[in-house]
Amino acid sequence: IKSKKRYAYTTAATPATLESTINYTYGDSAWGDLLTGYNGKTITSDTIGNMLSDGTWTYTWEHGRELATMSNGSTTWTNTYNADGLRTKRTNGSTTYNYIYNGSSLSQMTVGSNTLYFAYDASGTPMSVTYNGTNYYYATNVQGDVTAILNTSGTAVVQYTYDAWGKILTTTGSMASTLGAHNPLRYRGYVYDTESTLYYLQSRYYDPE
């Protein structure tokens, strides 16, 4: 990808007004497809392709693909992993997320006084979440994106929209600032880290930008 252009929505046959353009650059002599610039920001990486800085955050890594810390100058997040390489905790000293797994599937997350329990179908698609003792149900599209969270009456209390790469465009609904903000399962059912806007895919981290 050399550039990404965003146009206003239209039903016409030709694109509407151009709203934004993001340019990508690749300049590494040893690794031709390694991203070195994004939207005017310089990106640096280590020898195995882990990002070290993106113009906003700086990153440190352990044991290959395990993100150890990330810092934006004022806040540092530190991650902890279990023996299987699954992330079990991330904290910045004042806010702490704790994660529990059933096999490789996230089964429980706690942040502050809020605890969420997750259930999946046989294919691994998220089905339901219990949030502070109340059951809610996920609505997903054909590629597994969580597009809404429903209460037991079938009313959508949270709705998410994404771009084609998983960047969250909107979070709406009567519980957008509570359940909508705390729920980590978003695009393709991946675990979303709100503070960094990265998705945690266990074997790697994914930046939708």
Regions picked out by a protein language model, each given a short descriptive name:
Residues 1-37:
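Conserved catalytic cores of ATP-dependent inositol ring kinases
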Residues 3-10, 35-41, 52-57, 69-74, ...:
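Beta-turn initiation residues at beta-strand->coil junctions
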Residues 15-20, 73, 85, 93, ...:
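Residue-level signal for glycine
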Residues 24-28, 131-202:
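A motif-centric feature for acidic-aromatic and gly/ser/thr-rich catalytic loops and repeats
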Residues 119-131:
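Trp/Tyr-centric glycan-recognition "aromatic platform" motifs on solvent-exposed beta-strand/loop surfaces
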